[in-house]
């Protein structure tokens, strides 16, 4: 009798547990299934799309080129260094020789030369007839406190990271609007969500891109154009090596945080998933940057104190 009572009590326990949690679990599972189905459908939809990627000669841009190429896209590789673009193009064709896809084309592009951008976009349209996805990935960083950073460096950072990407976006939009289809993907940074010491110009450029994308997203929704903003944390690329100092010289060093960052390949994979899910604003970062973001909004005094201590440490080195 005792064993029977225990079994009955156990059965009742699991029945109550199922009664309480199934109404919660089932909708969650259904939502996850629908999300996966949408992701797979949109991933298939990438096949044959024309994708223009800036900063495609190295780092995240190069990784994105591989990911889009493998998805069957017509990849347009854009950057200043034509020789590096040739290398990336060769790698795509050799490493993925068995993939039935489209040969990538090269577009030498200097984002700081605003007057040339319209013609560059037109040349792509003449070849492919459309630009389905623009990936604003090209950019530069800076290492230096605000006062010691020459105003020419501030201008250069904003010119490349913000005005160049904005000009390219505006050049691509008319053809997208005419077709009632397109997507703008802008690679920002967690530093576009919150600023840190010795990155004033870089953070400002990324904050500006955040605001531009938020405004643009609302304005072009009527034309079925999607805007996705990606805010990664540190990625293991040459960003710090290629960064400028406050005087405009080459920084030329690999930061420890950058060296320990996420792999470009993993980040590129996450970006394609975000596109497939039709996400609008995505933070790809570990817990510390996410905590800093929420701290900035929920406990700003604490955030400011932490940043002050960080600045003191940087100023003493």
UniProtKB/Swiss-Prot annotation:
Its EC number is 1.1.-.-. The chain crosses the membrane at residues 11-31. Substrate binds at residue 189. One of its GO terms (cellular component) is membrane. NAD(+) binds at residues 52-76. Disulfide bonds: none annotated. Pfam families: adh_short. PROSITE patterns: ADH_SHORT (PS00061). Residues 32-317 are peroxisomal. It is an enzyme of class 1 (oxidoreductase). The active site is at 202 (proton acceptor). Putative oxidoreductase. Belongs to the short-chain dehydrogenases/reductases (SDR) family. This is Dehydrogenase/reductase SDR family protein 7-like. It comes from Anopheles gambiae. The lineage of its organism: Eukaryota, Metazoa, Ecdysozoa, Arthropoda, Hexapoda.
């Amino acid at each position: 009798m005792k064993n029977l009572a225990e079994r009955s009590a156990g059965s009742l326990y699991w029945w109550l547990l199922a009664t309480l949690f199934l109404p919660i679990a089932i909708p969650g599972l259904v939502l996850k299934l629908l999300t996966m189905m949408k992701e797979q459908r949109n991933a298939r939809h990438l096949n044959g799309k024309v994708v223009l990627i800036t900063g495609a000669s190295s780092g995240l841009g190069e990784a994105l080129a591989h990911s889009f190429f493998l998805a069957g896209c017509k990849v347009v590789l854009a950057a200043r260094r034509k020789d590096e673009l040739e290398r990336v193009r060769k790698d795509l064709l050799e490493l993925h020789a068995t993939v039935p896809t489209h040969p990538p084309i090269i577009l030498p592009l200097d984002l700081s030369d605003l007057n040339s951008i319209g013609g560059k976009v037109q040349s792509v349209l003449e070849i492919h007839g459309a630009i389905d996805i623009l990936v604003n990935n090209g950019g530069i960083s800076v290492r230096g406190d605000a006062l010691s950073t020459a105003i020419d460096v501030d201008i250069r950072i904003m010119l490349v990271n913000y005005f160049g990407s904005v000009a390219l976006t505006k050049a691509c939009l008319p053809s997208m609007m005419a077709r009632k289809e397109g997507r703008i993907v802008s690679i920002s940074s967690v530093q576009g969500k919150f600023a840190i010491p010795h990155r004033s110009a870089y953070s400002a450029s990324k904050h500006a891109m955040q605001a531009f994308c938020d405004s643009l997203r609302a304005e072009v929704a009527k034309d079925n154009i999607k805007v996705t903003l990606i805010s990664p944390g540190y990625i293991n690329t040459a960003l710090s090596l290629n960064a400028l100092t406050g005087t405009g010289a080459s920084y030329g060093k690999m930061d420890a945080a950058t060296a320990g960052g996420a792999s470009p390949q993993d980040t590129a994979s996450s970006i394609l998933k975000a596109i497939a899910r039709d996400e609008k604003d995505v933070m790809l970062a570990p817990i510390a940057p996410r905590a800093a973001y929420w701290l900035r909004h929920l406990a700003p005094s604490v955030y400011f104190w932490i940043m002050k201590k960080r600045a003191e440490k940087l100023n003493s080195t």
